[in-house]
Regions:
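A short glycine-rich, Lys/Arg-flanked "PGG" loop and its adjoining helix->strand segment in the class I
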Residues: 141-154
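Conserved class I S-adenosyl-L-methionine
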Residues: 31-39, 156-179
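A short acidic, Gly/Pro-enriched loop at the edge of an enzyme's catalytic core
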Residues: 119-128
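Conserved alpha-helix/loop element of class I SAM-dependent methyltransferases that forms part
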Residues: 10-30
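Short alpha-helix
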Residues: 93-100, 186-203
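Class I SAM-dependent methyltransferase SAM/SAH-binding core
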Residues: 42-45, 49-112, 117
Length: 233
């Protein structure tokens, strides 16, 4: 992330200069946008730069997060200790968002809540953006349904592993063989066919486009899913 004063904040992923491709060049000016899983806020701030009226949301606490099951995993062996370790990390992530929020003079609203509770919220948005989070959800199907229920116009699931299968398939996104933290939060690759079915059920048509991001200095390409509403709310 490059801040307004020219200073840079580094991280493993870099999509600077690629945001428009990342969201499939979807127009955002004048639209209300919900950024789900905002993390450091990069997508929210980029959407604001393009004239969107943004609300950002993320996990309230680590209790909202799930880990792959392993006997040696602290998440399963001692959940209280796992929460005590993870909540400070989540606070650091939130602090980085608020630092950027002040530096960019952002006007984005923020809500911290589990994804499945967003449907209790009496708000709808023109566009819902979920950037590279679906593979990190143990229940991506319900989450996609939530995104769709909140979107008046479009859902954009950015830079996300997609199985090429046209059947109604959930494939594991990794071998599920390592309890190491960097691997234990990656769950599923939803198939093209299953994306189409879920969104059709919710009144959307689906397009898959390719986009690029830099991971630890190496370019990587993945699909972005653009679902456009064809059945009005």
């Amino acid at each position: 992330m490059t801040l307004p004063d020219g200073s840079e904040v580094s991280g493993p992923w870099d999509i600077r200069g690629r945001f428009d491709e990342y969201i499939g060049h979807y127009p955002l000016r004048g639209k209300t946008v919900l950024d789900v899983g905002t993390a450091t806020g990069f997508l929210a701030f980029e959407a604001e730069k393009r004239g969107a009226i943004v609300t950002a949301t993320d996990a309230h606490s680590a209790i909202d997060m799930k880990s792959l099951p392993f006997q040696t995993s602290l998440h399963f062996a001692n959940k209280a200790a796992w929460l005590a370790a993870m909540d400070p990390w989540l606070i650091t992530l939130k602090n980085s968002f608020w630092f950027g929020w002040h530096e960019y003079k952002s006007k984005a609203d923020v809500l911290y809540a589990p994804i499945d509770r967003l449907t209790l919220w009496d708000r709808k948005f023109d566009v819902v953006i979920a950037g590279a989070i679906v593979e990190h959800l143990s229940d991506p199907i319900t989450a996609i349904g939530v995104f769709a229920s909140l979107a008046k116009e479009a859902v954009i699931i950015g830079f996300t592993p997609v199985s090429a299968n046209e059947g109604l398939i959930l494939e594991t996104a990794t071998p599920w063989s390592s309890p190491e933290p960097e691997f234990s939060y990656t769950w599923w690759a939803v198939s093209r066919g299953l994306y189409k079915r879920i969104f059709a059920n919710m009144g959307f048509d689906v397009e898959f486009v390719e986009c690029e991001a830099i991971c630890n200095g190496v370019p990587e390409r993945r699909p972005t899913i653009i679902a456009r509403r064809i059945s009005p709310l």
